[in-house]
């Protein structure tokens, strides 16, 4: 576990009688780019939500940077770490959601500067300088004083990526970042993620239905089915020579569809 920045150890997550994550063992190494693929309802997005403590777990253990996110109580229930501990942990994680989740009443610039000032204690000047650098990275420096409603979906998602990066995370989580976009806007978001993967020393974990993109940027691809990893390997291994029949069925459906 020494080189793994994310560890799931026999994690279980259920809603009543429906098990979403089924004794999941899963690790991501520092600096690794990992894509999670699989059918709807297989637990892909739940993995990211657990990492952000947006969802709890019923059993097992989750570690980020070697530190536990959850503690088991004497009665067997799972409780998150202390709020102080979680605040520290969350600064290591940046998440890009499907639906952008920008603050609609704030300009693009303020969307990027608010959390670094409040949470990290950056000065107004430091936060602004960092925000402008990130807007340059995502190609939106000329839109700094617009409000989210004045932007296209693709532009809003690029702001979402910049906002996550503004907290200087070690890990970036992407939850199907193009699923809410019109087809013609997908490319501009993928180009930003592609640049991050190539130029920045970030650990990246991405849930995606963009198979060709996952194949291009990933060090490893994991196929989820029924709350577990059914198969994993390099993009070449998993896409060209999948071992499991269920993996072959899924890839045939999504690539030929």
Curated annotation (Swiss-Prot):
<dbReference type="InterPro" id="IPR017871">
    <property type="entry name" value="ABC_transporter-like_CS"/>
</dbReference>
<keyword id="KW-0472">Membrane</keyword>
<dbReference type="InterPro" id="IPR014343">
    <property type="entry name" value="Ectoine_EhuA"/>
</dbReference>
<keyword id="KW-0029">Amino-acid transport</keyword>
<dbReference type="InterPro" id="IPR030679">
    <property type="entry name" value="ABC_ATPase_HisP-typ"/>
</dbReference>
<dbReference type="InterPro" id="IPR003593">
    <property type="entry name" value="AAA+_ATPase"/>
</dbReference>
<dbReference type="InterPro" id="IPR027417">
    <property type="entry name" value="P-loop_NTPase"/>
</dbReference>
<keyword id="KW-0067">ATP-binding</keyword>
<dbReference type="GO" id="GO:0005524">
    <property type="term" value="F:ATP binding"/>
</dbReference>
<feature type="binding site">
    <location>
        <begin position="38"/>
        <end position="45"/>
    </location>
    <ligand>
        <name>ATP</name>
    </ligand>
</feature>
<protein>
    <recommendedName>
        <fullName>Probable amino-acid ABC transporter ATP-binding protein y4tH</fullName>
    </recommendedName>
</protein>
<dbReference type="GO" id="GO:0015424">
    <property type="term" value="F:ABC-type amino acid transporter activity"/>
</dbReference>
<comment type="similarity">
    <text>Belongs to the ABC transporter superfamily.</text>
</comment>
<comment type="function">
    <text>Probably part of a binding-protein-dependent transport system y4tEFGH for an amino acid. Probably responsible for energy coupling to the transport system.</text>
</comment>
<dbReference type="GO" id="GO:0005886">
    <property type="term" value="C:plasma membrane"/>
</dbReference>
<keyword id="KW-0547">Nucleotide-binding</keyword>
<dbReference type="InterPro" id="IPR050086">
    <property type="entry name" value="MetN_ABC_transporter-like"/>
</dbReference>
<dbReference type="GO" id="GO:0016887">
    <property type="term" value="F:ATP hydrolysis activity"/>
</dbReference>
<feature type="domain" description="ABC transporter">
    <location>
        <begin position="6"/>
        <end position="251"/>
    </location>
</feature>
<dbReference type="InterPro" id="IPR003439">
    <property type="entry name" value="ABC_transporter-like_ATP-bd"/>
</dbReference>
<keyword id="KW-1003">Cell membrane</keyword>
<keyword id="KW-0997">Cell inner membrane</keyword>
<keyword id="KW-0614">Plasmid</keyword>
<dbReference type="Pfam" id="PF00005">
    <property type="entry name" value="ABC_tran"/>
</dbReference>
<keyword id="KW-0813">Transport</keyword>
